[in-house]
């Protein structure tokens, strides 16, 4: 049976328990939101195929448990990941502080060239905010990675975050291929117009 995709990207969602990783995953994969998700036990994944630059890209997105007792399970899944989203809850200071710990785990266990992005989730709950957008932006700048604020509940920037990460992974792959090509021709990566319409980019921030 012929493959229905051109590329397969393995992505990870990591962060403390309760920051909304499962909700972000379901919003992107199912366009659904459920406020009664229990904490993920172990690891689960969802698949969604998107189109970038005329290529079909299958995203295999792993939802890893944030609790400390599952850390030994999740670290086995860092290897092979091409993109990692580090998620914190803007209403939970501790989850933001722990992003640095998660980054250390990535540096220890993941591929050196893995694409990373920080997501400040639950930006719809601004009246309970404990972490300013500027602090999220500065943290991302410190590590040289991208940042967005998202809301799985209000469907803000979730689509855009996954497309941005996938686009960066594909651009890096294309650059490597060009380096091995005698022509060295360039290939731009674009989000389709249809997908652009589905994003909610303007309501929260992107760095």
UniProtKB/Swiss-Prot annotation:
<dbReference type="GO" id="GO:0043025">
    <property type="term" value="C:neuronal cell body"/>
</dbReference>
<keyword id="KW-0967">Endosome</keyword>
<feature type="binding site">
    <location>
        <position position="39"/>
    </location>
    <ligand>
        <name>GTP</name>
    </ligand>
</feature>
<keyword id="KW-0970">Cilium biogenesis/degradation</keyword>
<dbReference type="GO" id="GO:0042593">
    <property type="term" value="P:glucose homeostasis"/>
</dbReference>
<dbReference type="GO" id="GO:0005525">
    <property type="term" value="F:GTP binding"/>
</dbReference>
<keyword id="KW-0472">Membrane</keyword>
<dbReference type="GO" id="GO:0005764">
    <property type="term" value="C:lysosome"/>
</dbReference>
<feature type="binding site">
    <location>
        <position position="153"/>
    </location>
    <ligand>
        <name>GTP</name>
    </ligand>
</feature>
<dbReference type="GO" id="GO:0098887">
    <property type="term" value="P:neurotransmitter receptor transport, endosome to postsynaptic membrane"/>
</dbReference>
<keyword id="KW-0206">Cytoskeleton</keyword>
<keyword id="KW-0479">Metal-binding</keyword>
<dbReference type="GO" id="GO:0031489">
    <property type="term" value="F:myosin V binding"/>
</dbReference>
<feature type="lipid moiety-binding region" description="S-geranylgeranyl cysteine">
    <location>
        <position position="204"/>
    </location>
</feature>
<dbReference type="GO" id="GO:0010008">
    <property type="term" value="C:endosome membrane"/>
</dbReference>
<feature type="binding site">
    <location>
        <position position="19"/>
    </location>
    <ligand>
        <name>GTP</name>
    </ligand>
</feature>
<dbReference type="GO" id="GO:0031410">
    <property type="term" value="C:cytoplasmic vesicle"/>
</dbReference>
<keyword id="KW-0597">Phosphoprotein</keyword>
<dbReference type="InterPro" id="IPR005225">
    <property type="entry name" value="Small_GTP-bd"/>
</dbReference>
<dbReference type="Pfam" id="PF00071">
    <property type="entry name" value="Ras"/>
</dbReference>
<dbReference type="GO" id="GO:0051223">
    <property type="term" value="P:regulation of protein transport"/>
</dbReference>
<dbReference type="GO" id="GO:0055037">
    <property type="term" value="C:recycling endosome"/>
</dbReference>
<dbReference type="GO" id="GO:0030496">
    <property type="term" value="C:midbody"/>
</dbReference>
<keyword id="KW-0966">Cell projection</keyword>
<feature type="binding site">
    <location>
        <position position="17"/>
    </location>
    <ligand>
        <name>GTP</name>
    </ligand>
</feature>
<dbReference type="GO" id="GO:0048169">
    <property type="term" value="P:regulation of long-term neuronal synaptic plasticity"/>
</dbReference>
<feature type="binding site">
    <location>
        <position position="18"/>
    </location>
    <ligand>
        <name>GTP</name>
    </ligand>
</feature>
<dbReference type="GO" id="GO:0005768">
    <property type="term" value="C:endosome"/>
</dbReference>
<feature type="binding site">
    <location>
        <position position="40"/>
    </location>
    <ligand>
        <name>Mg(2+)</name>
    </ligand>
</feature>
<dbReference type="GO" id="GO:0003924">
    <property type="term" value="F:GTPase activity"/>
</dbReference>
<feature type="binding site">
    <location>
        <position position="20"/>
    </location>
    <ligand>
        <name>GTP</name>
    </ligand>
</feature>
<dbReference type="GO" id="GO:0032456">
    <property type="term" value="P:endocytic recycling"/>
</dbReference>
<keyword id="KW-0963">Cytoplasm</keyword>
<feature type="binding site">
    <location>
        <position position="23"/>
    </location>
    <ligand>
        <name>GTP</name>
    </ligand>
</feature>
<keyword id="KW-0333">Golgi apparatus</keyword>
<dbReference type="GO" id="GO:0032880">
    <property type="term" value="P:regulation of protein localization"/>
</dbReference>
<dbReference type="GO" id="GO:0005929">
    <property type="term" value="C:cilium"/>
</dbReference>
<comment type="subunit">
    <text>Interacts (GTP-bound form) with MICALL1; regulates RAB8A association with recycling endosomes. Interacts with MICALL2; competes with RAB13 and is involved in E-cadherin endocytic recycling. Interacts (GTP-bound form) with MICAL1, MICALCL, MICAL3, EHBP1 and EHBP1L1; at least in case of MICAL1, MICALCL, MICAL3 and EHBP1L1 two molecules of RAB8A can bind to one molecule of the effector protein; ternary complexes of RAB8A, RAB13 and either MICAL1 or EHBP1L1 are possible. Interacts with EHD1. Interacts with MAP4K2 and SYTL4. Interacts with SGSM1 and SGSM3.</text>
</comment>
<keyword id="KW-0342">GTP-binding</keyword>
<keyword id="KW-0547">Nucleotide-binding</keyword>
<feature type="short sequence motif" description="Switch 2">
    <location>
        <begin position="63"/>
        <end position="80"/>
    </location>
</feature>
<dbReference type="GO" id="GO:0005813">
    <property type="term" value="C:centrosome"/>
</dbReference>
